[in-house]
Design a protein with these regions (language model features):
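N-terminal intrinsically disordered, cationic/polar leader segments
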Residues: 1-54, 90-121, 127-147, 151, ...
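Alpha-helical segments in soluble extracytoplasmic regions
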Residues: 47, 51-72
Length: 157
């Protein structure tokens, strides 16, 4: 017999349900986990509890970086078509920079990498919502690390 590999995809219908908020949440989480890792490393004495905690923090940080890459690739590859690309021809370069920064966040524990990634994600988010004709505004995230994110201005009920 042969083994069938597990395959995952967005829906490929296309469903038209795309939202970069998951990417923003993951990027904020990366910065938060970098902060927690660096706090943990400030302790002069590393012990098994610290090491276990560091292992968990690094693992979850890397999961979020992987999610950033996956979600950005899905929106870029499935949502962005010729009309959006014509309007924003630099989106390919932006996506490449996001991929590189997400990898850097996996490789290193430097806060500035996470903050720079968030800036690129915010730019991607602005472009995404603009392609849908939805205005955006900048707000502080209501949880640590309390950095600026781009939010769509939604219709009131």
């Amino acid at each position: 017999m042969f083994k069938i590999n597990k395959v995952q995809a967005h829906c490929d219908i296309p469903c038209k349900v795309y939202d970069p908020s998951v990417i923003q949440y993951s990027t904020l989480s990366i910065v938060r986990f970098i902060d927690l890792i660096n706090e943990e490393l400030k302790d002069a004495e590393l012990n098994t509890n610290n090491i276990a905690q560091l292992s968990r923090l690094v693992s979850v940080k890397e999961q979020h970086a992987k999610e950033v890459k996956s979600e950005v690739a899905t929106i870029w590859g499935d949502y962005f078509k010729e009309p959006q690309i014509s309007k924003f021809p630099d989106v390919h370069t932006l996506v490449h920079e996001i991929m590189q920064l997400a990898s850097k966040c996996k490789q290193e524990n430097k806060r500035e990498n996470g903050v720079e990634l968030l800036k690129k994600i915010n730019k991607f988010t602005e472009i995404f919502w603009e392609t849908k004709g939805i205005k955006t505004e900048k707000k502080y995230a209501p949880y640590p690390p309390e950095l600026v994110i781009v939010c769509p201005i939604l219709k009131s009920v």
